[in-house]
Curated annotation (Swiss-Prot):
InterPro entries: Biotin_BS (IPR001882), Biotin_Carboxyl_Carrier/Decarb (IPR050709), Biotin_lipoyl (IPR000089), Single_hybrid_motif (IPR011053)
Subcellular localization, as worded in the UniProt entry: Cell membrane
Enzyme Commission designation: 7.2.4.3
Name the record gives this protein: Methylmalonyl-CoA decarboxylase subunit gamma
Cofactor dependence: biotin
Organism: Propionigenium modestum
Pfam families named among the record's database cross-references: Biotin_lipoyl
SUPFAM superfamilies linked to this entry: Single hybrid motif (SSF51230)
Keyword terms of this UniProt record: Biotin, Cell membrane, Ion transport, Membrane, Sodium, Sodium transport, Translocase, Transport
Gene3D superfamilies in UniProt: 2.40.50.100
An example Gene Ontology biological process: sodium ion transport
Reported function: Biotin-containing subunit of the sodium ion pump methylmalonyl-CoA decarboxylase, which converts the chemical energy of a decarboxylation reaction into an electrochemical gradient of Na(+) ions across the cytoplasmic membrane, thereby creating a sodium ion motive force that is used for ATP synthesis.
């Protein structure tokens, strides 16, 4: 029987362990800790990426129209706007279900809905145009 002292969360316990039958197993020698690698030279900071320009449609929308796209694939649960509706920045345009979570897709700026390209129950991919604002 071997006795050990074990500390768990700051509390010390005396533990007795008895070997039960079977052949003795030779244990491997304790491995020495590997030498710590030399710290790498710090990399220069990368220049920040420019902010993406608002996405505009090539066809079917007037000049200055902006699109609201799906950020991820999913299913449209609710369309909360119609063509001709005036919307303010932050208004919920569409509710998209993705990975069993409801994601509110909001208006990026004030404007008028010129076209709604999805309907309730539609499946969309990331980048698909949901709503066109002007």
């Amino acid at each position: 029987m071997k006795n050990f002292k074990v500390t768990v969360n700051g509390t010390e316990y005396d533990v007795a362990v008895e070997e039960m039958g079977g052949a003795a197993v030779a244990s491997a020698p304790a491995a020495r800790p590997a030498a710590a690698p030399a710290p790498a030279a710090p990399k220069p900071a990368a220049a920040p990426a420019p902010a993406p320009a608002p996405k505009t449609t090539a066809a079917g929308a007037g000049a200055g129209a902006n699109t609201v796209t799906a950020p991820m694939p999913g299913t449209i649960l609710n369309v909360g706007c119609h063509a001709g509706d005036k919307v303010s920045k932050g208004d919920t345009l569409v509710v998209l279900e993705a990975m069993k979570m409801e994601n509110e897709i909001m208006a990026p700026h004030d404007g008028v809905v010129s076209e709604v390209r999805v309907q309730q129950g539609a499946s969309v991919n990331a980048g698909d145009i949901l709503v066109v604002l002007s």
